[in-house]
Amino acid sequence: MTDQRPRAESRSLTAPSLIGTNGHFASVGDAAHDPKAYEHGVQVIDEEKQFNPNLSKYLSLENVANAGFNYHLISVFGSQSTGKSTLLNHLFGTQFSVMSDRERRQTTKGIWMSKNKTKHEDPNARMADNILVMDVEGTDGRERGEDQDFERKSALFALATSEVLIVNIWEHQVGLYQGANMGLLKTVFEVNLQLFLKDKNTTHRSLLFFVIRDFMGTTPLKNLEITLLEDLSRIWASLSKPQGLERSTIHDYFDFAFYGLPHKGYKPEEFAAEAKKLGSRFREGRRDRKEQLIGASIESGVFLPEYHRRIPADGFAHYAEGIWDQIVNNKDLDLPTQQELLAQFRCDEILREVLVAFDEAIVPFEEKQAAGVRAGEPTILGGLGPAMRGARTKAVKNFETEASRYHKGVYQRKRTELEGKIDTRLKALFQGQLNAAHKSGVKDFSDAVSNAVKAGQKKGASYDFAEIVKQETQAALERFEKEARATVVEGTAWSNYKQELKLYQKDLGEVSGQLRRDEMRRLATRVERWVKSRLSHSVSLEFNSLGSGRGGSGAPETGDKPAENKIWDRIWNLFVQTVLDAERRFTDRATSLDASVEEVDVGLWRLRRKSWSVLRLKIEEEMMEGNLLLKLRENFEDKFRYDEAGVPRIWRPTDDIEGVYTRARESTLTLIPLLSKFILAENNSPPPLDRWIGHTPSSATAADEEDLTPIGGVDAEDGRSLEEEMTILNDAKRQDLTVRFKKAADGVYVEAKRSAIGGITQVPLYFYGLLLALGWNEIWAVLRNPAYFFLLFVCAVGAYVTYQLNLWGPMLKMADAASKQALEELKKRLREFLEASDTGRQAMAMSANATGRDAGEEFEMSSLNRGGKKAEDEDENDDI
């Protein structure tokens, strides 16, 4: 009856001297959460061929998983009950179960693993680090009988994973076939050839270390070595070898070492000493090129580099599980494929782990950048460059450290995959950072230029736009390059920002061009306003001078009076001169704006057209029917009411009123046809407007022309000729104006005629006879009295002189003005008197209330322009 194995929770943590079946080890099926269960070791494969999924847990607890390639694996073979576990316990300080002295039965079922526990104080005898020992179920046991399936599978598993295979035999079994485990070794040789066929590029070399137990020394160890090697060579020669390996020898695939141990029961002290000495052999060594057998040097280490399977410790559990899965399912064992699968599995795990750390560093920046994009305000992320470089370097380095130990092809492929994933995300961040720097840089550049221009305008237009653009462009490029350089990740092709820099420069050029065009438009507007102000003043003066055909109040203060028939010549010359001044101002300012020749040509062309439109509107305003009729009447009255010296006429019945009236009227009527068309008196033709404006520049765009008023004789699509453009009054308006003027002139004539004959018709003739009859005595009294006579004489002389000098009119006006002033002064004194008394104040208050009730609203008369809107003064001093 088989002993029942206790539960893991109830096992003793310290193994007793005799244990049935490694009950103190963590076996297949035990829970992985209890670290104490792994104190002594772990069952790798149970007797039912089940692999333990918790092997990686044991390696982690023993601090082997992080050792990389710095670990070694030893397997022990031998017949059942030959002391394999005892040998391992003495060599490596393990606690594998050993057979009881009271009964002989199988104690090791399946494959068990434990880590080396032996520590040597002598540095020269120090064993290698992280030695893992696998105790394999013994062969030729009665429990399995003739079933050699597990024997073959365990041998194949041990050979695929182990560096050193310890063969435990007794001295008296040397030379025997079954007793010396030659059948097992034949199986080992066969599976080794099977592995070679699957991976011809790699020779899987292993060390067969024969430990000869109960060595008495009677037969020299060298002779025993020769016997064993001869037997092994015969077995190798008997194997059916694949094509190309017919002449291969056993030494092409295996190295051999031999060591003899005394009898443990009879010579326990010698056994312990030799076991300790043998244990010191399990260290790392180097092969001498002249050595053929490792046993040639007893003191050399057994762990040679070519024995190592080059499986990283953290992937060994997964690799071993894959190997056993293929073995137990009777599949051809393909170690290269298993190594690639392991590399694929581990590299994927490592890749995910490094990406987790990468996400912790990068995701916050990605979220901030995405939030800015959603808000429509891309944000420059501070510290992005160092974070990107640090995260990428750390991720790649960690992956390289952990994954470079695996299959090189898989490692390189997975590293490329990792770099691709990382670079895809970092590139998006890099592009987003450059995009944010681009947009914010363009905005800052535009604001900086605009602010500098405004500051210059406040200082009196003393700014150089081209210099401002140059300085701000340089500053913007430096800021962009600074941000780009700070975000560059060295060693990546995608972090080259030269193309983005060129695009940024292009956009800055477009923005500066747009700002220059905006400034040019503002300049053009200021110049046009300046032209309008100057023309409004000058043209108004010219039309006001139409009434200066006499020497009165309408005449110029100095110089000769202007010729009325040359009014258009004067207006045209003033217009041309004003526009020339404006062109010089425009050209000077445009040059400071770094405008191109084409832009200046278009600006001057627009300025001339706009200026003509301003002049045309001003002329139409002055030539409005009401304004023109008023000017004609003033011109007529100046010529009719004043003489050539500018002295007002006092009409007498003897004056030639009809002649003066006719001459003044006809002279004024000649102005109507003169003013009806813009014709220069110099050549009796319209001004050369088409040549003066010039052809449309080739660089002008549709936007440059859309706000321009068509001009007859210049724009063919307008359909009007130059003569029509210069026509101010058509025939119908001229006739109507003539009729209305004549009526107004007739009224003035009638008024003058009435004033001339008014003094005579008011005094009847009989009044003079009556005055003479009644005042005869007074007349004689004056004539007889010298004083009265002299006073009368002086008055008569004064009246005559006044009449001759035509001073009666001014004297009467002066008398009238004096009387009005005296009346106002009287009213003022009366008001002051009334305000000084209570009765007067009450009377004034009652009068004011009555006036407020009876009086209607008062309206102020305002001057209107030709469009019927209130005319406002133009600013005549625009700063351009």
Curated annotation (Swiss-Prot):
Transmembrane spans: 763-783, 787-807
Cellular compartment(s): Endoplasmic reticulum membrane
Residue stretches in coiled coil: 463-517, 812-839
Chief localization: endoplasmic reticulum
GO biological process: endoplasmic reticulum membrane fusion
GO CC, any one term: endoplasmic reticulum membrane
Boundaries of every GB1/RHD3-type G domain copy: 68-307
Amino-acid positions noted as binding GTP in the UniProt annotation, renumbered to this chain: G78, S79, Q80, S81, T82, G83, K84, S85
Molecular function GO labels: GTP binding; GTPase activity
Top-level taxon of origin: Eukaryota
Region of interest (Disordered), ranges: 846-880
Keywords, sorted A to Z: Coiled coil, Endoplasmic reticulum, GTP-binding, Hydrolase, Membrane, Nucleotide-binding, Transmembrane, Transmembrane helix
UniProt-listed Pfam families: RHD3_GTPase, Sey1_3HB
Record membrane topology: Multi-pass membrane protein
Cytoplasmic topological intervals: 1-762, 808-880
EC number from the UniProt entry: 3.6.5.-
InterPro entries per UniProt: G_GB1_RHD3_dom, P-loop_NTPase, RHD3/Sey1, Sey1/RHD3-like_3HB
Stretches assigned to the Lumenal side: 784-786
Family: Belongs to the TRAFAC class dynamin-like GTPase superfamily. GB1/RHD3 GTPase family. RHD3 subfamily.
Function: Cooperates with the reticulon proteins and tubule-shaping DP1 family proteins to generate and maintain the structure of the tubular endoplasmic reticulum network. Has GTPase activity, which is required for its function in ER organization.
PANTHER family to which the protein is assigned, alphabetical: PROTEIN SEY1 (PTHR45923:SF2)
Name of protein: Protein sey1
Annotated organism of origin: Talaromyces stipitatus (strain ATCC 10500 / CBS 375.48 / QM 6759 / NRRL 1006) (Penicillium stipitatum)
